[in-house]
Amino acid sequence: MLALKISVYTVVFFFVGIFLFGFLASDPTRTPNRKDLESPQD
């Protein structure tokens, strides 16, 4: 039972990590204007 929980948590965290990483990585690409908002001095 413990091994089952470990494998389930591993798979869940694996997919969640990929989802968050892909979302954060594609977020600035979809909104290039955000760079101007983050650095208005430029």
Swiss-Prot record:
Task: Tell me which Pfam families the record gives.
Answer: PsbI (PF02532)
Task: Please tell me where this protein is predominantly located.
Answer: membrane
Pull one GO CC term from this UniProt entry. Answer: plasma membrane-derived thylakoid membrane
Q: Where are the transmembrane segments?
A: 6-26
The keyword Thylakoid is annotated on this UniProt entry: yes
Any one Gene Ontology biological process term?
A: photosynthesis
Q: Enumerate the UniProt keywords alphabetically.
A: Membrane, Photosynthesis, Photosystem II, Reaction center, Thylakoid, Transmembrane, Transmembrane helix
Q: How does it sit in the membrane?
A: Single-pass membrane protein
Could you confirm whether the keyword Membrane appears in this record? Answer: yes
The entry's localization annotation reads:
Cellular thylakoid membrane
HAMAP family xref list: PSII_PsbI
Q: Give the protein's biological function.
A: One of the components of the core complex of photosystem II (PSII), required for its stability and/or assembly. PSII is a light-driven water:plastoquinone oxidoreductase that uses light energy to abstract electrons from H(2)O, generating O(2) and a proton gradient subsequently used for ATP formation. It consists of a core antenna complex that captures photons, and an electron transfer chain that converts photonic excitation into a charge separation.
Which protein family is named in the record?
Belongs to the PsbI family.
Quaternary structure, per UniProt, is: PSII is composed of 1 copy each of membrane proteins PsbA, PsbB, PsbC, PsbD, PsbE, PsbF, PsbH, PsbI, PsbJ, PsbK, PsbL, PsbM, PsbT, PsbX, PsbY, Psb30/Ycf12, peripheral proteins PsbO, CyanoQ (PsbQ), PsbU, PsbV and a large number of cofactors. It forms dimeric complexes.
Which protein is depicted? Answer: Photosystem II reaction center protein I
